Design a protein with these regions (language model features):
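Conserved acidic catalytic loop of the alpha/beta-hydrolase fold
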Residues: 153-155, 165-182, 194-198
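Gly/Ala-rich beta-loop-alpha elbow adjacent to hydrolase catalytic centers
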Residues: 185-193
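Catalytic histidine neighborhood in serine/cysteine hydrolases
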Residues: 372-394
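Short, surface-exposed "cap/lid" segments of acyl-processing enzymes
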Residues: 76-154
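Alpha/beta-hydrolase-fold enzymes
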Residues: 2-52, 56, 179, 196-315
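Catalytic histidine-centered segment of alpha/beta-hydrolase-like enzymes
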Residues: 362, 388-404
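Short beta-strand/loop motif that positions the catalytic acidic residue
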Residues: 347-348, 354-356, 360
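Conserved alpha/beta-hydrolase "acid-adjacent" motif
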Residues: 361-367
């Protein structure tokens, strides 16, 4: 007779494998429908219904196949201000179990003044979600990014990864890059980037970044509650563990690891705007049926990225909900790392800029701005904020408003707060 714990573990693994089976089956059904309606013989019996079935199959196969694949960065080159094309080579600067420090190396280019570390969210999507952000910064900056790994591919032997580990990763990456680095945190990592900087302020002051730009993140979720924060308060930790956490199945290297599955996260993302997504896929099927769709059309470019989801470790998800949203440890300035209090007021020499979107329905205006009230040791001359009119959550780090309004503000902010300290010798390869 199995022990209760063994039965529970098998239940969690069975649920994980069941979701993967459903995804795989839908991909197969789409591929089968597309193949069956593509036989030349079907042309002998012209029927609009066959075109619709073929289109449904093509869209379905593509959509479900993208859910388990990490997108490429697809940044082979960019055009600089002189109209010259520059090649781009993504290089791993620092490899770790749960994420790498990635540098977008530009061969033959003189090193740029601004060294930027983008802290990418670990919230269901890959760091490639910031592709357009990276591309927009390349002409003026040496760009680095946190490239987080899919938890399903990380063996259990690698250990845990929670909000404290995330904070320590950011601190290590900042140490590696040196004090002339400008940290730009986007959405979910905002409170942890603030904590990592405060951690360095006490443990290694010379490694603090020159500036810290915080874009639309939940420093104080209760400052302006949204559906996301309301959900965090409406469920208990026990309910979250029971309904959201599963164990990776036998198909992947992380077999047995407790995770918040990417497929489950995706279902939550889609349910928030179900009508909008249903309309988008219906319209795309119609375009494919009329032979008006393309491999790189607007729909495919967006959904190839949106549907590509990754598992996050259970302890990271649960500790984020409990410590950032429920207990508000960052907002109350009582966050700890390895038992040591991280005091945000210890930040005294790092310029901080807040970016928020007026129509942000994920991290509402005010949630990120709360960081400035915590920085009691920082002079007002080193504090700045910007509320972008009409911008939603994604609009503050991608799209037209980012390119035309927000990006120039950040570049100017970095220029005004640059440090001339020589680069860490260990990073001499950062010159591009």
């Amino acid at each position: 007779m199995r022990e209760p714990m063994q039965e529970t573990n098998m239940k969690y693994m069975a649920m994980y494998d069941w979701m993967e089976t459903v995804r795989n089956t839908n991909q197969w059904l789409g591929a089968s429908a597309r193949a069956l309606t593509s036989y030349p013989a079907t042309a002998a019996m012209p029927n609009p219904m066959l075109d619709w079935v073929r289109a449904w199959g093509e869209v379905t196969e593509r959509s479900f196949s993208r859910m388990t694949v990490k997108p490429d960065w697809d940044i082979a080159h960019f055009t600089n201000s002189k109209g010259q094309d520059r090649l781009v080579e993504p290089r791993v600067v620092m490899a770790r179990d749960f994420g790498d420090l990635l540098h977008f190396h530009i061969p033959g280019r003189t090193k740029k003044r601004h060294k930027v570390l983008l802290a990418a969210p670990m919230s269901g999507h890959y760091a490639t979600l910031l592709r357009s952000t990276v591309l927009s910064l390349l002409p003026d900056c040496e760009v680095y990014i946190t490239d987080w790994h899919n938890a399903r591919d990380i063996p259990v032997s690698a250990g845990k990864f929670d909000v404290e580990d995330y904070t320590l990763y950011l601190a290590d990456f900042m140490r590696e890059l040196g004090p002339e680095t400008h940290m730009v945190a986007v959405c979910q990592p905002v409170p942890l980037a603030l904590a990592a900087t405060a951690y360095l302020a006490k443990e290694n002051p010379d490694a603090q970044p020159a500036s810290l730009t915080l874009i639309g993140g939940p420093v104080d979720p209760d400052a302006n509650p949204t559906d996301v924060t309301d959900f965090g308060h409406s469920v208990s930790m026990g309910q979250l563990h029971e309904t959201m956490i599963q164990r990776v199945g036998f198909k992947y290297k992380g077999v047995g690891r407790k995770v918040y599955p990417g497929l489950l996260q995706l279902s939550s993302f889609i349910s928030m705007n179900l009508e909008k997504h249903a309309t988008a896929f219906g319209d795309q099927i119609a375009r494919v049926a009329r032979d008006e769709a393309g491999d790189h059309d607007k729909h495919n470019v967006f959904y190839d990225e949106y549907l590509a989801v990754m598992d996050m470790t259970a302890e990271f998800y649960l500790s984020t909900v409990e410590r950032i949203f429920k207990e508000r440890e960052i907002a109350r300035n009582c966050f700890t790392v390895n038992g040591k209090k991280v005091d945000i007021s210890k930040i005294t020499d790092v310029a901080v800029k807040i970016i928020e979107g007026e129509n942000d329905d994920i991290s509402g205006p005010g949630q990120c701005l709360a960081a400035l009230d915590l920085l009691t040791g920082l002079p007002d001359t080193k504090k700045a904020s910007h509320l972008e009119p009409g911008a939603g959550h994604y609009g503050i780090f991608a799209g037209r408003k980012w390119r035309e309004n927000i990006r120039p503000l950040i570049i100017d902010f970095m220029a005004s707060n640059a440090r001339t300290t020589s680069t860490n010798a260990a990073n001499s390869n950062s010159a591009a």
